[in-house]
């Protein structure tokens, strides 16, 4: 049983964070009850999602009263490949006052209760917010040079990509979005206008929030842009954005609202669109392993190459700022990381040296964690790690790790047993009741995963072909497509 109590004095300076009630959990729920008593002088909005039961509405003196009760909730939330915001009934509750220190949209200025308000009204608030934050922008010397170079490019999409990828370069090397999330709509529109690139404005929500057609809160909206060829641009992110030509996975196939209007765009006209998605061939991870048995140890050299959305969140973890600056900066005349500091030469060189020391430790730690994550156990020894390709433009992000593992080779009499399954990637552990599933499996995007293992065995040993069949027999081919079953290539 959870109790929440908020003092009205808090609402004079800031609003209460949104409250979410999920009608489901990790285990079946016998009895779930929600009771709310909210001052009538506040604006109370709620939205029920995915078939969540509605509140019974009432009043008590100066308060709005909301009650809901559900018994015997048998539906549970699996841990694997499940999106609660798309698959579990839940209700979002927003309580707002007209506080001075925050921007309060028009729809939230009406006192009292608004049950499941029209999403278009909240969309109008989001367009208005975009409009009031629109302004002219100035940039530092190097960025202005990039803009001037972009103007020389004949293709409008490539002009936009050139500027966006430079901003992405700065985002990666500084580990911080070059344009803030809230300013992106204003600053990138300013840049596209400056570059004379035609565009549509988009309002969209990501897959971790409600659909735009059921919008409940303007702060869940993302400002974006779509060109006539379907190319889209969204706020820079250290977690999801890779390059201009790859739409972040959290926005793919999401419904959006668009307008082509340039002046007074907040008034429309609007149209419904869908952000383009990707295919499995666009998002690939290719793993090549050379493994050698050394007694009961396994010496492994593993190369991992990713494309598309599979690059998300990986580049910064394993690549030094210096290497990223040189690879991503080649098109912009950047030859070293220090050039990306808007400081004097001495200060820039000093900061670059400090960053190099930080990278040396953090990258080593990240690679150690990567090896542990891949095999579900730590390496005995890490011999070498290196990034071969930094993933700039549409190139793969590729790295090589050389290490030694124990526990993957065991002696059984005169035989050696190799845990080949732990060479093909991290194992998914699905236990107990979750092994029987009656809800959809939701992956963030389609992908292709391929592993090639070359195992060098000691002299005098041969491989039993029958043992490889176990890698196929444990897979239900009606659920997962295997383009090429495991086979013995050579001994």
Residue ranges of each PLM-predicted region?
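Leucine-rich, highly hydrophobic segment in Treponema pallidum outer-membrane-associated proteins
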Residues: 280-297
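Short, Gly/Pro- and small/polar-rich lid/capping loops
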Residues: 267-279
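Hydrophobic/aromatic-rich core segments of domains that either
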Residues: 166, 183-269
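Short, well-structured beta-strand/strand-turn elements
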Residues: 171-175, 193-209, 445, 461-467
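Secretory-pathway-linked proteins and extracytosolic
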Residues: 8-18, 22-171, 293-347, 408, ...
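Hydrophobic, well-ordered secondary-structure elements that form the walls
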Residues: 192, 302, 455
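Conserved structured core elements
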Residues: 28, 137-140, 154-161, 178-186, ...
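A carboxyl-terminal module marker
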Residues: 318, 328-479, 483, 487
């Amino acid at each position: 049983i959870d109790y929440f109590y908020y003092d009205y004095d808090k609402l004079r300076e800031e609003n209460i964070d949104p409250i979410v009630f999920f009608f489901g959990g990790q285990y079946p729920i016998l009895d779930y009850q929600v009771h709310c008593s909210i001052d009538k002088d506040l604006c109370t909005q709620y939205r029920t999602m995915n078939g969540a039961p509605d509140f019974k509405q009432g009043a008590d003196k100066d308060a709005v009263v909301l009650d809901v009760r559900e018994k015997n909730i048998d539906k549970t939330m699996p841990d694997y490949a499940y999106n609660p915001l798309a698959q579990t009934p839940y209700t979002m509750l927003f309580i707002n006052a007209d506080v001075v220190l925050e921007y309060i949209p028009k729809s939230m200025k009406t006192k009292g209760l608004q049950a499941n308000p029209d999403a278009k009204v909240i969309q109008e608030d989001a367009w208005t917010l975009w409009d009031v934050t629109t302004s002219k922008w100035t940039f530092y010397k190097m960025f202005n040079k990039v803009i001037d170079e972009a103007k020389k490019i004949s293709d409008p999409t490539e002009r936009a990509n050139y500027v966006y990828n430079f901003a992405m370069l700065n985002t990666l090397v500084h580990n911080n979005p070059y344009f803030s999330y809230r300013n992106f709509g204003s600053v990138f529109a300013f840049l596209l206008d400056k570059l004379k690139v035609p565009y549509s404005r988009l309002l969209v929500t990501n897959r971790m929030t409600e659909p735009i057609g059921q919008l409940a809160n303007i702060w869940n909206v993302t400002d974006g842009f779509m060109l006539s060829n379907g190319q889209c641009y969204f706020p820079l992110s250290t977690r999801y954005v890779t390059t201009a030509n790859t739409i972040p996975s959290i926005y793919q196939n999401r419904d959006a609202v668009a307008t082509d209007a340039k002046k007074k765009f907040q008034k429309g006209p609007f149209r419904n669109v869908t952000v383009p998605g990707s295919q499995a061939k666009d998002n690939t991870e290719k793993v090549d392993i050379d493994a050698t048995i050394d007694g009961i140890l396994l010496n492994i050299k593993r190369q991992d190459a990713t494309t598309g959305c599979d690059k998300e969140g990986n580049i910064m973890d394993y690549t030094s700022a210096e290497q990223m600056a040189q690879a991503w900066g080649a098109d912009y005349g950047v030859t070293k990381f220090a050039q990306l500091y808007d400081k004097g030469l001495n200060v820039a060189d000093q900061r670059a040296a400090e960053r190099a020391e930080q990278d040396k430790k953090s990258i080593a730690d990240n690679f150690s964690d990567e090896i542990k994550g891949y095999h579900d156990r730590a390496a005995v020894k890490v011999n070498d790690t290196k990034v071969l390709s930094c993933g700039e433009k549409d190139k793969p992000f590729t790295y090589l790790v050389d290490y030694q593992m124990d526990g993957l080779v065991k002696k059984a009499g005169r035989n050696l047993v190799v845990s080949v399954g732990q060479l093909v990637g991290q194992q998914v552990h699905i236990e107990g009741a979750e092994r029987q599933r009656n809800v959809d499996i939701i992956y963030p995007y389609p992908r292709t995963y391929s592993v090639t293992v070359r195992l060098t065995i000691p002299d005098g040993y041969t491989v039993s072909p029958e043992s490889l069949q176990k890698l196929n027999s444990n897979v239900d081919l009606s659920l997962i497509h295997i383009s090429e079953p495991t086979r013995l290539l050579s001994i």
